[in-house]
Structures are given as structure tokens and as C-alpha cells.
Amino acid sequence: MAPKAVQGNGPGFTKEEKAAMRAAARERKVRSGAQDAEREVLEKIAGMDPPDRRMAERVHALLRSEAPQLAPRTWYGMPAYANAEGEVVCFFRDARKFKTRYATLGFSDAAKLDDGKMWPTDFALLELTSAEEARIVELVRRATR
């Protein structure tokens, strides 16, 4: 028996999740050069709300200087940074993306953050001070070792 279509407010994907999936499908169709990919990341950052935009700009600058081996690209419509194999290592999700109260710096399974049998992969960001920036640099260095 075929599953019934989900209607109304029942279980299923949110409007924001569907938009992210459409963005990912577009990204797979249009794999452009490195300059175009970075331009697309910068356009995504420019479209963010001011507090998240400032943090995303700073995260982008940190990653470009501290992890130049990571290539900027978009991933599900978010700024992301991929290794030489094209695997996303980390990404920046603005608060508006999924209507959360904080932005997120997230790491994928390609990041080498393993620490025992359990470790964090997403970090909430409300503000970036020098302490958070130092933590980000340390995490990215671990993730790319």
C-alpha cells in the first residue's frame, strides 16, 4: 500500500527545510568554479540579517586565513567550506534559515573532531568576540588535521 500524502500541519518537512532541499538540488546542478563559488558564498552572507551577517563575514575571514585549504561553496543554501575531496567540513547557518534564536557554526562528518564516543558538531553563536574566534580557529584546525 502506498503511503498517504502529508497534508496540512501534520508531520513532514517545514517550508524552510523544503527551501534548503531545493537550494541543495540547484547547487548540485550548478557546480561552478572556485571564484564563482566564493562569490555565491559572499552573496549568501550579504543577504543575512545584520547581526548574523557580521558573524558570517568574520567566520568567512577566519576560515580563509586559518584554513586556506578549505574551499568556500554553498551547501543547502548556506555558506560552507569543503576539503580537497569536495566534502563539506563546516558551515554557517544564520538564525533566520530555520527560525532559530541563534546562528550556528556546524561541522559535518568530514570534520575530524572525534573525541571518544561522543562530541559536539554544532555550536550556537550569539556574538563573536575574540574568545569565540579563538575557539573557532582551534576547532577548524582540529577538523582539518
Indicate where each model-derived feature is located.
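Charge-dense, helix-prone N-terminal extensions
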Residues: 1-145
